[in-house]
A protein has these predicted regions:
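Alpha-helical junction/boundary sensor with strong preference for TPR arrays
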Residues: 43-44, 80-81, 116-117, 153-154, ...
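Partner-binding and oligomerization surfaces adjacent to conserved cores of proteins
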Residues: 274-277, 281-283, 289-719
Length: 719
């Protein structure tokens, strides 16, 4: 430890400089500050003074006194010593950035010249400049800064980071070839972690270019020792690539390389879910159950489904599994069509919209309310009533869950929905229509995360970083939020006649959206074809009754023929083997849920009718759980005009995510995603038009086109 042999006032300036630097190396910052601050410009040469101020700034910074550090470094002039000046400017740039003063940081870093500074100082300055420009959403300037960094000048880590960042900037700018070229420059010996990130990006780029083999080769370059989390992400991608090639064994091997202790819980669960899905599709339910069990904290439905199926008598397991597979196919058909249904509307009170947007700077969370509060008394019961009409008297619907929904519609500016919903003080047409972008919802529809597992003691979870299922930490006194949910369209069914249709956009909306009639007609034609395909799939997997000659045809909502001039026609829906039916012969070989349930419960020779009471109960429990995702997606035909789609959360009443207020009769859960960033536009009913300017303040900041629209529907509110 350094100890001076004489007082500071008896030392030369050089001795005080040496002493201060020595104190700095020993982290004795107070003493370093005292020694270095005693050196005045007029008593020493410029280089010595610059060195003292550089060290003084470091001592202040290490002591947490950033303002004094900035003052010290600012005392150094380029004419004192160009290399020390460059180091000081680098430090200043970092200090300003830490203080949130980006423009001053840019000014400091930009003052460092390649020809005057040490190479590592110049390259670090360019790296920092690029990061600031990136954060300012100035990709061209960021690319220019990072492109200034040469391998021969920079240390390997700085060069690798610059090349990785460059690749990301190119990829985000749509310059995929340049991204590939740039990421390919990063070597493993430069920085293993950054190399792994570059290889991960390379694989994604190759995959996007339709080069799966090159993507697989690239992701395979990433080692667990490089970074366990990046390795896990690469293995997740590898598994998906192999799965797309139907190489099930390689996919399972890749996903099995992801270890629970090395990654975040959701990544591990996703890998195990994928493994379970392969085994389930192959009919290996025991191994599927094992994998799903590992994923149940995030993807409970599949685990619960397989578990219940395996608890049933072996002679009915295959049929129950067929019901499960049909359910999956139906849910795929109920998903939105991104190219045509990328925006959906939610009708609400204007006052509620203001709280969601955060006009008080503290936005509230979007809510899913209990199903018991909706205006449809048949919610969750329509399928039950339909099964009863088919002669199935057993109770195969569930009524002991806590179900929460939030409803959306393809009708963005609907007179009737303005009259029914979002009413202020009970007055019609006083609400607003919030039009959401598709990014508000989950883009991973295969996991059915909206069905939660049995409630656990969340007090134990709070000891584990108080994290919820989305990985988002909440305060001690806050309820957990539900993560992004998949948006599903509803099926509208008349349980007495069996007549049904899917929620969908109206033809008129295409003419509102597209000015040119030919464009609107073309888009409508493509959309109509997509919806027809979805309807055929739902018919095949849910409603098809098979070869009943007495019920050879049924009437459906509209004709799938080629006459576009007729808006509503009769669609002949074959329930047998008519080759002219739009449902293919191959699809007719598939036993629908209706057919399977009918055979189980109405055929006296079916194994179900030979089971004892306990076994029958297990079978009923399995069927109820399998069909649970569909129970609240089938609505009564009377509500068809609403063209509804919805997100759901189905859980137990003990779930601690549930908010309740008995006096106000409130029960709801809160959604994780903020509302304001996902709003495409807002339609104001006539009664809410007075709030137009207030909504514009919140929604139109920085945008050239207003997101706030006044409804064009004719309506006169009776006072």
């Amino acid at each position: 430890m350094t100890e001076p042999n004489k007082p500071l006032d008896q030392m030369t300036a050089q001795e005080r400089l040496d002493l201060g630097i020595s104190y700095l190396g020993e982290s004795r910052f107070d003493k370093a500050i005292k020694a270095l601050s005693s050196i005045r410009r007029e008593e020493v040469n410029p280089e010595t003074y610059a060195g003292a101020q550089l060290g003084l700034g470091v001592a202040y910074a290490e002591s947490g006194e950033l303002k004094q550090a900035i003052e010290a470094w600012s005392n150094i002039r380029r004419s004192d010593d160009s290399k020390i000046y460059a180091q000081a400017q680098l430090n200043l740039g970092a200090a300003y950035a830490k203080s949130g003063k980006r423009e001053q940081s840019i000014e400091a870093l930009s003052s460092i010249r390649r020809e005057e500074a040490a190479p590592e100082i110049y390259t670090q300055a360019q790296l920092g400049l690029g990061l600031i420009y990136r954060d300012q959403d100035k990709p061209d300037q960021a690319i220019e800064a990072w492109s200034n960094i040469r391998r021969e000048e920079a240390d390997p880590e700085t060069y690798a980071e610059a090349q990785f960042n460059l690749g990301v900037a190119y990829a985000e700018s749509g310059k995929r070839e340049q991204a590939i070229k740039t990421w390919s420059k990063v070597r493993h010996e430069d920085d293993p972690k950054v190399y792994a990130l570059a290889q991960l990006g390379l694989g994604v780029a190759y995959h996007a270019q339709g080069e799966p083999e090159q993507a697989i080769k690239t992701w395979s370059n990433i080692r667990r020792s490089d970074d366990s989390k990046i390795y896990a992400e690469a293995q997740l991608n590898l598994g998906a690539a192999y799965h797309a090639q139907e190489d099930w064994e390689q996919a399972i091997e890749a996903w099995s390389n992801i270890h629970r202790e090395e990654v975040d819980p959701e990544t591990y669960a996703r890998a195990q879910f994928n493994i379970g899905k392969i085994y389930e599709d192959k009919g290996d339910l025991e191994r599927a159950k094992e994998a799903y069990c590992n994923a149940q904290d995030f993807f409970y439905y599949n685990y619960g489904r397989v578990k219940r199926i395996l608890e049933c008598p072996p002679k009915v397991i295959e049929k129950l599994h067929d019901i499960a597979k049909n359910t999956d196919e139906i849910l795929k058909s109920l998903q939105i069509i991104p190219d045509f249904e990328s925006r959906v509307a939610h009708y609400s009170r204007a006052s509620t919209a203001f709280t969601l947007f955060g006009d008080d700077k503290n936005p509230s969370n979007f809510r899913l309310s209990t199903i018991r509060g909706v205006n449809d008394p048949t919610e969750g019961l329509v399928l039950r009533d339909y099964w009863e009409q088919q002669g199935i008297s057993e109770t195969i619907h569930t009524n002991d869950t806590a179900t929460f929904v939030s409803c959306f519609t393809f009708n963005h500016d609907s007179l009737n929905q303005f009259r029914l919903y979002g009413k202020e003080d009970g007055r019609e047409a006083t609400g607003v229509s919030l039009v959401f972008k598709k990014e508000f919802f989950s883009d991973q529809p295969d996991t059915l995360g909206f069905i939660a597992g049995p409630s656990t003691d969340l007090s134990s979870k709070s000891e584990q970083n108080k994290s919820n299922e989305t990985g988002k930490t909440e305060g001690d006194n806050k309820k957990q939020l539900i993560g992004k949910s998949t948006l599903y369209r509803c099926i509208y069914l008349d349980p007495e006649t069996g007549y049904w249709t899917l929620a969908q956009r109206d033809k008129s909306t295409f003419y509102r959206e597209h000015n040119e009639e030919a464009d609107a007609r073309g888009k409508w034609g493509k959309y109509y074809k997509s919806i027809s395909t979805k309807e055929d799939d739902v018919e095949t997997h849910l409603f098809n009754k098979g070869n009943n000659e007495e019920e050879d045809v049924e009437t459906h909502l509209f004709n799938k023929g080629n006459n576009e001039e007729e808006d509503v026609e009769t669609h002949l829906l074959n329930t047998g083997n008519n080759d002219n039916n739009s449902v293919s012969n191959e699809n007719n070989k598939i036993k629908s849920i209706s057919q399977i349930l009918n055979s189980i419960f109405t055929d006296k020779n079916h194994p179900y009718n030979k089971c004892n009471k306990y076994e029958k109960q297990k079978i009923l429990e399995a069927i109820r759980f399998i069909l649970l995702p569909l129970q609240y997606l089938v609505k009564h035909i009377a509500f068809q005009e609403e063209q509804e789609c919805r997100i759901m959360y189905i859980t137990q009443f003990r779930d601690e995510k549930i908010h309740s207020d008995r006096e106000k009769q409130w029960m709801y859960v809160e959604y994780e995603e903020p509302v304001l960033p996902h709003i495409d536009k807002i339609w104001l009913s006539p009664g809410a038009a007075k709030d137009q300017d207030f909504f514009r303040i919140l929604l139109d900041q920085g945008s050239g086109k207003s997101k706030v629209r006044i409804s064009q529907n004719p309506f006169r509110n009776k006072e």
